[in-house]
Amino acid sequence: ITTRLVGSEMCIRDSHHPDWEQRLKKMLDMFLQLQNPDGSFPRKFHDDFTVVDGSGGSTPSATLPLVMGYKYFKDKRYLSAARRTAEYLEKELISKADYFSSTLDANCEDKEASLYTATATYYLSLITNGTEHNHYASLTRKAAYFALSWYYVWDVPFAPGQMLGDIGLKTRGWGNVSVENNHIDVFIFEFADVLRWLSKEYNEPRFSDFAEVISTSMCQLLPYKGHMCGVIKVGYYPEVIQHTNWDYGRNGKGYYNDMFAPCLLYTSPSPRDA
């Protein structure tokens, strides 16, 4: 379950599909069964709830649908569970600046853990007030600063004849994935909105300025008629974009790695849209 799934279900009530609401509630209730006493969620598990990977680095991915579930169903159990995730995130990730293992295939520091942590506490700040709101906002800012350390502020050179060089890709504004998976990708989802919100919340224009750099840079490889960027379908965005000599076993620097499925870009509503 992800924010994209929960977000898409936000319109279901108006569309008169109560069966989908019940399915969604069932998934959220299953989430509650998976949560550990310390507030974390396992990274991988079987459908019988047997834990395959108990690493808590993916915990913020659970916060988002729990908050959305609370906003939609008004069930305080989901909000309570979301708050408990934030306690874990603050203690184990944010306070230690140790954002680890959010990507499914890396056991190391990675961008997504900090990116999703910032988004998770952002969601909580949107549905709280006063001291609690301020606390979550502060956590969001700390996590966002760390996430931004993964983003390029220069353009990696490509050799003549490499596809990305021929396309004219500028890496400024793109984020590296992890220490283990040393490539850039388009995985950002709501992070630019988080940065814009932080800019207003703290009167800090650097956040919104860099959100603009990210947003415009991400559009470089979006395929459309007359600008297909080596992709066969309009609207499909390649996920693994190889800007280093890191050996992924396919194509090499300056090309896409077609062993990985492309991401299809779309938008998700936030709690304030509910």
Please report, for each region that a protein language model flagged, where it lies by residue.
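Residues within HEAT/ARM-like alpha-solenoid scaffolds
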Residues: 15, 19-22, 57, 73, ...
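Exposed, low-structure sequence patches enriched in small/polar residues
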Residues: 142, 188-196, 200, 204-252
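Long, well-ordered core segments of solenoidal/helical folds
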Residues: 19-42, 76-100, 138-158, 209-228
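Single conserved hydrophobic/aromatic residue that forms the stacking wall/gate
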Residues: 1-7, 12, 266-274
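Alpha-solenoid helical-repeat scaffolds
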Residues: 4-8, 13-17, 26-30
